[in-house]
């Protein structure tokens, strides 16, 4: 291994560690709140929808899998759908209408009032994710966003926004999946280990 290659590894790891430490020091309460919102959504019999492009599509599928299968603890499957996986649906919409509508039309077909849409976009401006957010709000879904660079257009469309304001997309993505893992673990915690903590929100739908 050359010294230059080793330096690249260490610098990336150090910068990523600093970013995660800084982000979670400032946003730990927001992550807990996001997980509580997810838990309330699921406890009320609703579902989670995920969408994103490229690496964010992979994150959407990753997180949906953690909910449907399990994360760390043994528990019943939880309803979550990644809108990035059905190539027939995606190519039909993209071919007949527009790539910008591939998630929007799925939200219109699958999303119901009380569900939650989680949109992932490192720019916050992916047109198909933005349109999906608009569709979700029109149908009465809660909206959560994982973004970078200030949140972009998604900032004004999300009930709760996790914006990792950093210039390197790769590091933003690394924090996104850490946020996602924490949301999975904390949602399980609220649903199966600390159910009493959810009671105030289960009684009062306006706070969910």
Swiss-Prot record:
GO MF annotation list: carbohydrate derivative binding; D-sedoheptulose 7-phosphate isomerase activity; zinc ion binding
InterPro entries reported in the protein's UniProt record: GmhA/DiaA, Phosphoheptose_Isoase, SIS_dom, SIS_dom_sf, SIS_GmhA/DiaA_subfam
Subcellular location: Cytoplasm
Entry's EC annotation: 5.3.1.28
Catalytic activity line of the entry: 2 D-sedoheptulose 7-phosphate = D-glycero-alpha-D-manno-heptose 7-phosphate + D-glycero-beta-D-manno-heptose 7-phosphate
Protein name as annotated: Phosphoheptose isomerase
Function description: Catalyzes the isomerization of sedoheptulose 7-phosphate in D-glycero-D-manno-heptose 7-phosphate.
